[in-house]
Amino acid sequence: MQIVEVKAGDTLYALARRYATTVEALAFDNQIADPARLTPGQSLVIPGGREGVRRCAEVNAYAYPNIAPEVLQEALPFLTALCPFSWRFDAQGTLIPLADERLVEAAYAADTAPMLTLTNIGENGGFSTELGHVLLTDGTVQDAVLEGVVERIRERDYYGLNLNFEYLQPFDRVAYSAFVKRAAERLHPLGCPVSTAIAPKESAEQEGFLYAAHDYAAHGTYADRVILMTYEWGYTFGAPQAISPVNRIRRVLDYAVTVIPRRKILLGISNYAYDWTLPWKQGSAARVLSDAAAVELAVSRGAEIRFDETAAAPWFNYVDAEGRAHVVWFEDARSVLARLRLVEEYRLAGISVWTINQRNRTLWKVIEGAFNAEKLL
């Protein structure tokens, strides 16, 4: 696998001849909508060869139940574990089921381990600080939730449990760590591992609802795998910037490896793009699109794709039909490879993709070129 950057005047036909492949293969692997059109700065994955020495690594991924069957089937061969998103619970501790039977069945057919993913998402669809507090401080509710988890794992044959609790009260930090410990003690005798997903902290003292309740050292002690959610620096309601900048990821990893065993860490990988209208105004929302759609947009608008070397992330500007300026930050083969190299550099267990609902053949080609995905089944 090679990665090349399109230069002015390049055509897919010329690139195919140069690298001894076909236009059809390049168009398919890179999800190129119109093979006759490229744009400068666009990165392409070229079939053949390997990026360095391929090591074994774990590849976890989240998916919503509405993922297209064909998109799921393309991803599963490259996955170690799949986390359908997500099971919830109410204030009495009753689990609210997720219609993920199709995903669990497909995962097992591909030797991919399906995980029951439990969150503190409330009725309104967002993470609920209050619901999380109830679970962490009410023993009766906690008992009911854990027993419900065990029943559902047995009923649907999940491989293990993934905990993704966000926006908890800072004063619930100790209680959340204790819950992770208790969940592991309940599930380990059943042969079920427990993983957690935690915010990208750069120090133990980092404050804020997103960070304070996540105790890196405790999760590293009690959980079998710890997913670092190293994305969303650029987010829907924030100012335009790279979604998953490598320079910020390094700060997180520099801290994380001092308190979490490296063999337990999965590095978060984003699989989406944001399109901001300029000038950006506080409270305005970016539009979410797939990485492939971002490239198509650049091509259709004749925009040159640039690459921020500090963040290791691609971006471009364009003007829409109404004359409004935009900036788009996304991920491409170069940015994905930069993050996979961090896994090797920091000797981590692997990666975790959020999410695989958007088709991204380039992502899988780059992962395939760097890793042999471990299979637990």
Predicted regions and their residues:
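Conserved, mostly hydrophobic/aromatic
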Residues: 82, 163, 226, 267, ...
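Short, acidic/polar
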Residues: 63-77, 139-154, 208-217, 331-342
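Active-site groove signature of glycoside hydrolases
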Residues: 83-86, 146-175, 225-239
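Acidic/aromatic/glycine-rich contiguous surface patches that form carbohydrate-binding/processing clefts
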Residues: 339-377
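Glycan-recognition patch characteristic of GH18 chitinases/ENGases
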Residues: 49-148
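Substrate-binding surface in catalytic domains of secreted glycosidases
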Residues: 91-98, 174-298
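Primarily a LysM-type cell-wall glycan-binding module
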Residues: 1-21, 42-44
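Glycan-binding loop/region signatures in secreted carbohydrate-active enzymes
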Residues: 120-132, 271-339, 369-377
